[in-house]
Curated annotation (Swiss-Prot):
Acts as a transcriptional repressor for zinc finger transcription factors EGR1 and EGR2. It comes from Homo sapiens (Human). The modification Phosphoserine is found at residues 172, 183, 328, 407. The keyword Phosphoprotein applies. There is a cross-link at residues 333, 480 (Glycyl lysine isopeptide (Lys-Gly) (interchain with G-Cter in SUMO1)). This is NGFI-A-binding protein 1. One of its GO terms (molecular function) is transcription coregulator activity. Isoform Short is found in myeloid leukemia cell line KG-1. There is a cross-link at residues 126, 129, 143, 212, 333, 355, 369, 373, 454, 465, 477, 480 (Glycyl lysine isopeptide (Lys-Gly) (interchain with G-Cter in SUMO2)).
């Protein structure tokens, strides 16, 4: 699959390096992860570089990593190797977003007018070659040999091209300085104000916890160590109000890139190294005796650097992403198939909370429903039992009254005695005042039909008189027994 063409100057630089290393298959991965800054790859430490390799999927292929490292070294030492033009990529398609304020593209003036007024401007104002190439095309072919090919470096990245001819990296628009090499001190290696302020805050917090140094011990040490005394002895003799004292402290407190170190020319300090140097300088300003204890100074400076680098880079990245409305090429890429895990966790938490509330509501309603069901069952059971008990009592009472009135011996037992002999659940209170239903019906009929009352009542009484005799008269039968055996 062919890699996408670069659209910005940073992407073009990355494209050239990957093309040189035959690693164009990683171009899209670098762009997706915001890796269009080649300078970041060159200045990255070992851990940061390995992390970048893991992000683009190159960490598992060490041979590819070695080829990329070699291409980066060649890009720093010999940028002319990366000046091959892209035939399918027009120069006008590369936006210039790092031009200085005095450049003709920024000011909106023509190249010819800018050339006429260039003598009145800053003589060393420099712009990338892509802008210079456009200007040369409008001026004619007479000056086309001055500009070689498309530049790979912008003004902010010019420090990586020190010691090389300007035709290889960038051109000066001043006619007097065409072809002059870049100055080694073109960009000062120093932290910005925000990072320096963060270092100062950390030093202020740490200073009270440091042990106080004895000035007499420092003087004794300088007396015994003549070399050290010759180097930094004059700093202890300066007054605190001396404006040159801090400058001398910064000169001799530097951990990385000190004036007497054997650092390779062209290799610049990274952010970590600059932070360590700044922390060491501010610590020595607080306590000059730390100049004589570089091991302790280095440990303290590294501790401050770790804290400052993390906080400052996090704050800077967050502020830049918050202030920009347009899409940044260095923003963290979020895959479509992998949504943000925080949103997923929030959704799961809300679902779990809704489920817990629903279960709590069901648990609170469940006892009420169970009690209602139990009460309904008990009520129905009790009503059914009461109904059965009432029916049994009524039938027993009617049977007793009928048997007493129509007894064959004509004897009526006392109601109170009969009630006393019966169990409590079978006793019928006020049995004397209660009449069977058929007696009430007979009374009503006799009142309504007096002519037929006698015959009807006599028939009814005959039936009632015959019923008890047949129901309760027990005929005694003698059971014949066999004689006993005399044997």
């Amino acid at each position: 699959m062919a890699a996408a063409l670069p659209r910005t100057l940073g992407e073009l630089q990355l494209y050239r390096i990957l093309q040189k290393a035959n690693l164009l298959s990683y171009f899209d991965a670098f762009i997706q992860q915001g890796g269009d800054d080649v300078q970041q790859l060159c200045e990255a430490g070992e851990e940061e570089f390995l992390e970048i390799m893991a992000l683009v999927g190159m960490a598992s292929k060490p041979l590819h990593v070695r080829r990329l490292q070699k291409a980066l070294r060649d890009w720093v030492t010999n940028p002319g190797l990366f000046n091959q033009p892209l035939t399918s990529l027009p120069v006008s398609s590369i936006p210039i977003y790092k031009l200085p304020e005095g450049s003709p593209t920024w000011l909106g003036i023509s190249c010819s007018s800018y050339e006429r007024s260039s003598n009145a401007r800053e003589p060393h104002l420099k712009i990338p070659k892509c802008a210079a190439t456009t200007c040369v095309q409008s001026l004619g072919q007479g000056k086309s040999d001055v500009v070689g090919s498309l530049a790979l470096q912008s003004v902010g990245e010019s420090r990586l091209w020190q010691g090389h001819h300007a035709t290889e990296s960038e051109h000066s628009l001043s006619p007097a300085d065409l072809g002059s090499p870049a100055s080694p001190k073109e960009s000062s290696e120093a932290l910005d104000a925000a990072a320096a302020l963060s270092v100062a805050e950390c030093v202020e917090r740490m200073a009270p916890t440091l042990p106080k140094s004895d000035l007499n011990e420092v003087k004794e040490l300088l007396k015994t160590n003549k070399k050290l005394a010759k180097m930094i002895g004059h700093i202890f003799e300066m007054n605190d109000d001396d404006p040159h004292k801090e400058e001398e402290i910064r000169k001799y407190s530097a951990i990385y890139g000190r004036f007497d170190s054997k650092r390779k020319d062209g290799k610049h300090l990274t952010l970590h190294e600059l932070t360590v140097n700044e922390a060491a300088a501010q610590l020595c300003v607080k306590d000059n005796a730390l100049l004589t204890r570089r091991d302790e100074l280095f440990a303290l400076a590294r501790q401050i650097s770790r804290e400052v680098t993390y906080k400052y880079t996090y704050r800077t990245t967050k502020s830049k992403c918050g202030e920009r409305d347009e899409l940044s090429p260095k923003r963290i890429k979020v895959e479509d198939g992998f949504p943000d895990f925080q949103d997923s966790v929030q959704t799961l938490f809300q679902q779990a909370r809704a489920k817990s509330e629903e279960l709590a509501a069901l648990s609170s309603q469940q006892p009420e429903k169970v009690m209602a069901k139990q009460m309904e069952f008990l009520c129905n059971q009790a009503g059914y039992e009461r109904l059965q008990h009432a029916e049994r009592r009524l039938s027993a009472g009617l049977y007793r009254q009928s048997s007493e009135e129509h007894s064959p011996n004509g004897l009526t037992s006392d109601n109170s005695d009969g009630q006393g002999e019966r169990p409590l659940n079978l006793r019928m209170p006020n049995l004397q005042n209660r009449q069977p239903h058929h007696f009430v019906v007979d009374g009503e009929l006799s009142r309504l039909y007096p002519s037929e009352a006698k015959s009807h009542s006599s028939e009814s009484l005959g039936i009632l008189k015959d019923y008890p005799h047949s129901a309760f008269t027990l005929e005694k039968k003698v059971i014949k027994t066999e004689p006993e055996d005399s044997r």
